[in-house]
Regions:
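Solvent-exposed, non-transmembrane regions of membrane-associated and secreted proteins
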Residues: 2-209
Length: 209
């Protein structure tokens, strides 16, 4: 009986710890997001049409003139905030999420904000990993096909995507996310840490204004 009580107490302590860590991560991300948005706004005097990238730059393939975005440096600009680099922010309206994205990843960074693990939005191979906090990517499994995702880089370029596939993967299946063939991949751990939830996205076709 004593053993059972100890296990229940341990589970309760773990639950409270996780909730505290989740709330703290949410607050930190909100503060950092404000800094990222401020850094982007500081160079917002550029013409809007030179800062938007809502369609895939395939001028030669579709017979049209190459777009201005084709000349972009494939490496995304990085801004330093509180000792860490950031490449922009990701927004998932269906989940009510808007989060800063760090330029590099490790487990310490994942406790703070989502991280760019591989690729670049300018090469259509961006992979963003995040902790399974509710305030980060813990609700990815709730997304539906067709949901919109946007990623805004530090130059203010807005990239708009559509969720095309949602999969549960093995932690060892790195190739599936790193070389998926999709323009954007979002992923996180399942609650038990045994698997990964990944959302594979492609760019949308920009609406004509």
């Amino acid at each position: 009986m004593a053993v059972g009580a100890a296990l229940i107490l341990s589970a309760l302590v773990l639950l409270l710890h996780n909730r505290y860590a989740d709330a703290r991560a949410g607050r930190e991300a909100e503060t950092l997001l404000a800094g990222v948005e401020a850094a982007i706004s500081s160079q917002a005097d550029e013409p809007e049409e030179t800062r938007r990238q809502e369609t895939r730059p395939t001028g030669e393939e579709n017979g049209t003139e190459p777009t201005a975005t084709e000349a972009l440096d494939p490496e995304m600009p990085v801004a330093m905030l509180e000792g860490y680099g950031y490449v922009g922010y990701v927004e998932i309206p269906a989940l009510g999420l808007k989060l800063p994205v760090m330029s590099d990843w490790d487990y310490t960074r994942l406790e703070i904000a989502p991280c760019r693990q591989f690729g670049s939005s300018r090469k259509d191979d961006l992979v963003i990993a995040a902790h399974n906090f509710e305030s980060h990517f813990g609700r990815l499994k709730e997304m539906s096909l067709g949901n919109t995702v946007t990623f805004t880089d530090m130059a203010g370029i807005v990239n708009t995507y559509r969720a095309e596939m949602i999969e549960t993967l093995s932690p060892k299946d790195v190739e599936a996310v790193q070389n998926s063939g999709y323009d954007l991949v979002l992923y996180t751990c399942t609650r038990d840490g045994q698997e990964r939830v990944a959302v594979f996205c492609n760019r949308t076709i920009a609406e004509k204004e």
